[in-house]
């Protein structure tokens, strides 16, 4: 006989009183209820955790999706900057104001610096506003011109196109003069000197350029650019030393940049030059063509040239001379009969203006004459950029 042996929670010992049995059964019932409650709570907690996980994964997927879209926008920008900017704006990843676009380019994360330079140099009204906002993100106060150029030229890569370079360097010069009032008489002075520094950087640190300019030559080449007056020699010397000791760091994206624009039809060799004095004599000189200038030295080992002939505004032509073969001339097609702007060093070390209306030069052979004429023509006409520089210099000269 099973006296009360069944019931909840298994058998009940027979030696318990009725009251004890009921108490035991009640304990077992409550235990079961607690176990059920715990299981229910576990289930509810699991459900809540699943919901939290789902919410987190939704947020994560939104962030992941946003990051993917930003990365896609950067890739599009590097392939086609206008399409890249448009994609980022359409997907609410970038505001459409010039200031926001400029900030995006200034941070430059994942962006090709050559493409940044091309975009900033464009002529569209919006791009010009972006360039202005981009330049305003640079703080040039209390920096000398080399320090400011270092900062500016690291934030993008200067394009090779003359008009783009002009707009960008004009914006730089205006910003520098605004941050440093009183350093230069005008933005034109800052503009011309900035290019002199960029060319100096290439001359000093490009291994293809054998003739390394000295501080004295750098100072000579920049006479009269401060509204017709000279800049302090100490300022120019400090800028020279800064570049000599540490070249510009140029973003390494590709080869189409300003430093490549300036150099390459370089040529050097012995030529005969007809003197410009009253007694016309032929003198053998070592000529170096570089940096849109023709330098001539008495000896190949000389550190300083005997003369410097800037090629801007000049033309070249083949001529016959009864005394020497293989001749050509440099002349100014716009001002016939006018002395060509050039300088030479006298025996006592004084730098004086040249007195040539034309420079007549004789090469050792017909082949070398052809090569020299070809290189000089290439140097004169290879980039409209030099016309822009010449325009700036004329503007400065006219303010005298």
Curated annotation (Swiss-Prot):
Ranges where the record places region C-terminal autoinhibitory region: 392-400
Binding site for a 1,2-diacyl-sn-glycero-3-phospho-(1D-myo-inositol-3,4,5-trisphosphate): 273-281, 285, 296, 306, 355
Coiled-coil annotated residue ranges, if any: 14-61
Tissue expression notes: Present in all tissues tested, with highest protein levels in brain and adrenal.
InterPro entries: PH-like_dom_sf, PH_domain, Sec7_C_sf, Sec7_dom, Sec7_dom_sf
GO molecular function: guanyl-nucleotide exchange factor activity; phosphatidylinositol-3,4,5-trisphosphate binding
Keyword set, alphabetical order: Cell membrane, Coiled coil, Cytoplasm, Guanine-nucleotide releasing factor, Lipid-binding, Membrane
Every PH domain range: 265-381
CC terms in the record's Gene Ontology section: adherens junction; bicellular tight junction; cytoplasm; cytosol; plasma membrane; ruffle
A Pfam family it matches: Sec7
CDD domains the record matches: PH_GRP1-like, Sec7
Subcellular location per the Swiss-Prot or TrEMBL entry: Cytoplasm, Cytosol; Cell membrane
Domain spans labelled SEC7: 77-206
GO biological process: establishment of epithelial cell polarity; Golgi vesicle transport; positive regulation of cell adhesion; regulation of ARF protein signal transduction
Membrane topology: Peripheral membrane protein
Function, in words: Promotes guanine-nucleotide exchange on ARF1. Promotes the activation of ARF factors through replacement of GDP with GTP.
Subunit structure: Interacts with TAMALIN.
Recorded domain comment: Binds via its PH domain to the inositol head group of phosphatidylinositol 3,4,5-trisphosphate. Autoinhibited by its C-terminal basic region.
The protein's name: Cytohesin-3
Species of origin: Rattus norvegicus (Rat)
């Amino acid at each position: 006989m099973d006296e009360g042996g069944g019931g909840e929670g298994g058998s009940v010992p027979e030696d318990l009183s009725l009251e004890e049995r009921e108490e035991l059964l009640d304990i077992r019932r409550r235990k079961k209820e607690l176990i059920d409650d715990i299981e229910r709570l576990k289930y509810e907690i699991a459900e809540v955790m699943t919901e939290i996980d789902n919410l987190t994964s939704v947020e994560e997927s939104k962030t992941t999706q946003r990051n993917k879209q930003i990365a896609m926008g950067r890739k599009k920008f590097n392939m086609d900057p206008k399409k890249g900017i448009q994609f980022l704006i359409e997907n609410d990843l970038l505001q459409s104001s010039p200031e926001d676009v400029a900030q995006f380019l200034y941070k430059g994360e994942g962006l090709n610096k050559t493409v940044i330079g091309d975009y900033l140099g464009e002529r569209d009204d919006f791009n010009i506003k972006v360039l202005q906002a981009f330049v305003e993100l640079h703080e040039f106060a209390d920096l000398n011109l080399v320090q400011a150029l270092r900062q500016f030229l690291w934030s993008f890569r200067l394009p090779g196109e003359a008009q783009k370079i002009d707009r960008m360097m004009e914006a730089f010069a205006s910003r520098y003069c605004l941050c440093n009032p009183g350093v230069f008489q005008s933005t034109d002075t800052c503009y011309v000197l900035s290019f002199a520094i960029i060319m100096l950087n290439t001359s000093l640190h490009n291994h293809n350029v054998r003739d390394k300019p000295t501080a004295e030559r750098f100072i000579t080449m920049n006479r009269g650019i401060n509204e017709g007056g000279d800049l302090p020699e100490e300022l120019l010397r400090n800028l020279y030393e800064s570049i000599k000791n540490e070249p510009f760091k140029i973003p390494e994206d590709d080869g189409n940049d300003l430093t490549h624009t300036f150099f390459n039809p370089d040529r050097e060799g012995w030529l005969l030059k007809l003197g410009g004095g009253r007694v016309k004599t032929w003198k053998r000189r070592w000529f170096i063509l570089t940096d849109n200038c023709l330098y001539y030295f008495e000896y190949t080992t000389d550190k300083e040239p005997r003369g410097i002939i800037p090629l801007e505004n000049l033309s070249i032509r083949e001529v016959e001379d009864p005394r020497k073969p293989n001749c050509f001339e440099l002349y100014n097609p716009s001002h016939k009969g006018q002395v060509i702007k050039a300088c030479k060093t006298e025996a006592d070390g004084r730098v004086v203006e040249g007195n040539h209306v034309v420079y007549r030069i004789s090469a050792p052979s017909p082949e070398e004459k052809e090569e020299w004429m070809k290189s000089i023509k290439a140097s004169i006409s290879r980039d409209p950029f030099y016309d822009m520089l010449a325009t700036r210099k004329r503007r400065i000269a006219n303010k005298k």
